[in-house]
Amino acid sequence: MSLNTKRRDFLKLAGLGGVVFASSLGPWGRALAASGQDFFFVQMSDSHWGFEGPANPEAKNTLKRAVAAVNALKHKPDFIMFTGDLIHGTPDDKLRQQRMTEFKAIVADLKVKDVRFIPGENDAGLDNGEMYKTMFGVSNYSFDHKGVHFVALDNVSDPNGFIGENQLQWLHTDLSRHDKAQPIVVFAHRPLFDLYPAWDWATNDGAKAIDILTPYENVTVFYGHIHQEHHHMTGKIAHHSAESLMWPFPLAGSQPKRSPVPWDSTHPFKGLGFTSAQTAGSGFEPSIKPIA
C-alpha cells in the first residue's frame, strides 16, 4: 500500500466501498447494531505543549482551541484518548514537569469525564517514562467498553523505539483472555508497522506486536507521531493515524529531511485536528475534525 494513503483510497483498497472505514466488520457490527451499543471516542495527539517556534506562532493557544473544538461537538464522546507527545520535550526536568502540569490544567477543561493518556517520546524518552508515570500513571494498560477491548501500548519509554519483551508478553497474556472474535482497539504513539523508518516513523519491534494481534479477527490500531492523516493495512489489521494539534509534517519521503510544514498565515491551523472514531454498526469509522 502507498506510504501516503488518504481516506477515500483506503476505503477502496480495504474493499469497503465507501460505506465504512475499519477492519472491524461482520458479527461484531451486527451485534452492536442489535444491542444499541454504538458509540464514539475522540483521539487527540501530539499537542507538544510548550513548543515555541515559527511552525506555529499560535502555539500557546492551539491546545486550548482543540479543547474548545471537542467541547463544541454536538454529542459528547464516550471517552478521549491522547496518543502521546502531550508536551514538547526538554532535558530540563523542572521545565518538563511544569509543561506536564500546565497540559493537565488545560485538558481538565474537557467536558468529558473519561480522559486517558499514553506517552510519546517527548513525554517519556528522556527518563524511560519515570516522570510521565508520576504525572499520568501507568504507560500501558487495557480496558473494556461496550463490548470492545482497548489496549494502550507504550512504544516510546525505550528511547530506541522498542515495546520490549516484557510488555509484549503482557500484551499476549492480556489478549489471551479474550475470544478471537472480540473487537480489539490498540492505541500507540509510534506506528507499529514500518511506515518510514528513515524519519523514525516505525516501532523497532512492532512486527512482534502485529504477530500477537493477527489471530484476532477485528483489530484496529490508532496512533500519532507522524502529525498527519494516514491509513494502512497489515493483513486484516487497519492502522489509522491522527493529525497533530501543533504542526503538520509533510508526506513521508517528500523531502530529504523531516521538518514541520511551514505555517500558512492565510490558512492558520491548517492540517491540525483530532479524530472522531464512531462505531457505525459495521465497524469503526474514523474521521478527522479540524480545529481551524
What are the residue ranges of the model-derived segments?
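N-terminal active-site segment of His-dependent metallophosphoesterases
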Residues: 13, 28-97, 173, 180, ...
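N-terminal export signals
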Residues: 1-4, 9-30
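Extended active-site neighborhood of metal-dependent phosphoesterases/phosphodiesterases
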Residues: 92-183, 203-220, 232-287
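Short acidic, glycine-rich surface-loop motifs adjacent to enzyme active sites
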Residues: 179-195
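Short, solvent-exposed aromatic-acidic interface loops
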Residues: 288-292
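Active-site neighborhood of phospho(di)ester-bond hydrolases with catalytic His/Asp-centered motifs
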Residues: 44-45, 80-84, 115-121, 187-188, ...
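Short, motif-level signal for alpha-helix interfacial/capping segments enriched in acidic residues
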Residues: 25-30, 61-64, 200-216
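Solvent-exposed loop/turn segments at secondary-structure junctions
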Residues: 47-50, 86-89, 121-125, 156-159, ...
